[in-house]
Amino acid sequence: KTAIKPGAPREIFEIQPLSQAKYVVSYYTGAILDLNQHATLLVFDSLWGGDSHGILYRDLREKKGICYYVDSQLDRFSGVLYTMVGCSHSDFSVVSNSIEQALCHMRSEQFSMENLVHSKALIKNRLISAFHDRDLNLRILLSSIITEYNVELDRLSECVDRVTIGDISLLAKSLIKGVEYFLHDQ
C-alpha cells in the first residue's frame, strides 16, 4: 500500500533569502511490491539523476550548465521518486521543461545501453557493499518488518541484471507527477 496517494499536480513557490534556488519535483511510483519492480526503480533512479552519469546531470549540469547540483532519490516507503535541482531563479522554466523533456526521452527509450549497463553496475556494487554494512542490513531488516516486503540483496542483484531498456521505459510511462516545489529568492 502506498503511503502517499497521487492527487492533482500542485506547484508550490516559496521565497526566502538564499544564494541558489532549489527545485524539487515528485513522481508517484506506486507501491513497490516485488524485487523486479524494486530493481527497475533502483536502475531508473541511477539513470535519471541519482548518479553523475544520470540523464539529468549530464543535460542540466554538463551540457546546459544551468544547475549547481542534480539528484534523485527513491522513497520506496511512500512510493515517491524525488528529483532535486539547485539552480538560479531565472533558470526555473528551462530546468522544469528540461526535466519534462528528459522524462519523455526515458518513456520513448531514447537513452543509451551504455548508460543502462553503467547504472546496473553501480547498483550491483552498492548491493555488494550493503552485504557488509551492519547499519544498512539493520535498516533493510526493519523495513522488511514494517512493509512485510522481504528484500534479499542477492536476489535483488539478480533482478538488477535483468532490467532492460523496455522496463525503464514502462516505468517512466507509469510515473505520475506530484508536487513541484520551488524555493527561491526574489
Spans of features found by a protein language model:
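Alpha-helix boundary/capping and short turn/kink residues
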Residues: 53, 108-109, 150, 165
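Regulatory input/activation interfaces that engage signals or partners
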Residues: 39
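M16/insulysin-pitrilysin zinc metalloprotease superfamily fold
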Residues: 71-130
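Non-catalytic beta-strand/loop surface segments
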Residues: 1-35, 46-97, 156-179, 186
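C-terminal regions of mature proteins
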Residues: 117-186
